[in-house]
Amino acid sequence: MMFRLTSVSCFLLVIACLNLFQVVLTSRCFPPGIYCTPYLPCCWGICCGTCRNDNSSLTFLQFCLPFFFFLRPSHPLFLLLPAR
């Protein structure tokens, strides 16, 4: 019984350590020009599919509008644009 309890607790400890390493190793940001998502953020600037520098006080849509013009109407990101 003691061997089983020890092996189970070691197994759970290994799983907890692996989860901790995953969080530590994936908590990073990306420089300009690299692909980004809300879960893989930019170090600075705005994520418009790729990280872009924001050197002004532009809003998200003003800054990302050139990127959105290249999207097809069936693309999910196209729905973020205001109705015309």
Curated annotation (Swiss-Prot):
Q: Which GO terms describe its cellular component?
A: extracellular region
What is the documented function of this protein? Inhibits the vertebrate voltage-gated potassium channels Kv1.1/KCNA1 and Kv1.3/KCNA3.
What's the family? Belongs to the conotoxin I2 superfamily.
Protein name in the entry: Kappa-conotoxin-like Im11.3
Organism, scientific name: Conus imperialis
* Tissue specificity annotation: Expressed by the venom duct.
Q: What is known of its domains?
A: The cysteine framework is XI (C-C-CC-CC-C-C).
| Propeptide boundaries | 71-84
**Signal peptide location:** 1-26
Task: Tell me the keywords, alphabetical order.
Answer: Disulfide bond, Ion channel impairing toxin, Neurotoxin, Potassium channel impairing toxin, Secreted, Signal, Toxin, Voltage-gated potassium channel impairing toxin
Q: What is the lineage of its organism?
A: Eukaryota, Metazoa, Spiralia, Lophotrochozoa, Mollusca
The reply on keyword Signal is yes
